[in-house]
């Protein structure tokens, strides 16, 4: 006995099935995404440390590994496929993790690997010339990264954007309520 699902967009069908299977829409976990060409791994490590020091139980999905208390595995991809993402968020929730920090690559955004993930917030580090074999040009690359911020499912979202980066300043125009940060612009502030 085999069930077959027909859908015009197989990637959408996959993440919807993953979300339904692992009920990631109702988890008791705050998910934060970090995107940018450079600095995602460093940012997730810093966030993990700060949140742990603040008393949170933290999980991290990123370039080096996927880890949470009692679990660590080498990461074959910066951002895994939807089945793995949703499964791991459910596993973290079952282990009492209350904050998950995730590196979100442009490939993952474009390929719908993080669709259905209940992001509570996101951070943008920078955008430099990379992955143009995939995105064709910087404008397409930027628009893909911006989707993480513009398509966040929660109304109350926390956004942090590097205002020292020219693409970050452009993202701030699209997300005026975001917290801006940077060395050149002074202390973090809302625009």
Where would I find each of the regions flagged by the language model?
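Short beta-strand-centered segment that lines the nucleotide-binding/catalytic pocket of NTP-utilizing
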Residues: 55-69, 104
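Short, basic phosphate-binding NTP loop
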Residues: 1-33, 43-55, 189
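Hydrophobic anchor at the start of a short beta-strand
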Residues: 58, 99-100, 178
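Residue-level signal for inorganic ion chemistry
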Residues: 17, 34, 61, 85, ...
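Flexible beta-alpha connector loops of hexameric P-loop NTPases
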Residues: 71-82, 130-137
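Conserved lysine of the Walker
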Residues: 40
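Acidic, Mg2+-coordinating active-site environments of NTP-dependent enzymes
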Residues: 1-2, 110, 119-191
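Conserved nucleotide-sensing/catalytic segment adjacent to the nucleotide-binding pocket
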Residues: 77-105
């Amino acid at each position: 006995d085999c069930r077959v699902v027909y859908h015009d967009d197989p990637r959408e069908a996959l993440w919807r099935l993953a979300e339904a299977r692992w009920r990631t829409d109702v988890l008791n976990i705050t998910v934060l995404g970090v995107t940018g060409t450079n600095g995602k791994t460093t940012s997730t490590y810093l966030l993990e440390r700060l949140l742990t020091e603040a008393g949170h139980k933290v999980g991290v999905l990123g370039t080096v590994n996927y880890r949470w208390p009692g679990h660590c595995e080498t990461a074959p991809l910066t951002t895994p496929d939807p089945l793995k993402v949703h499964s791991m968020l459910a596993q973290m929730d079952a282990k009492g993790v209350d904050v998950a920090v995730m590196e979100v690559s442009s490939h993952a955004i474009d390929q719908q690997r993080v669709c259905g993930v209940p992001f509570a917030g996101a951070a943008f580090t920078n955008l430099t010339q990379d992955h143009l074999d995939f995105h064709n040009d910087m404008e397409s690359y930027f628009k893909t990264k911006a989707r993480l911020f513009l398509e966040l499912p929660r109304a109350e979202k926390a956004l942090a954007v590097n205002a020292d980066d020219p693409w970050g300043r452009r993202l701030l125009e699209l997300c005026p309520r975001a917290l801006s940060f940077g060395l050149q612009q002074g202390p973090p502030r809302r625009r």
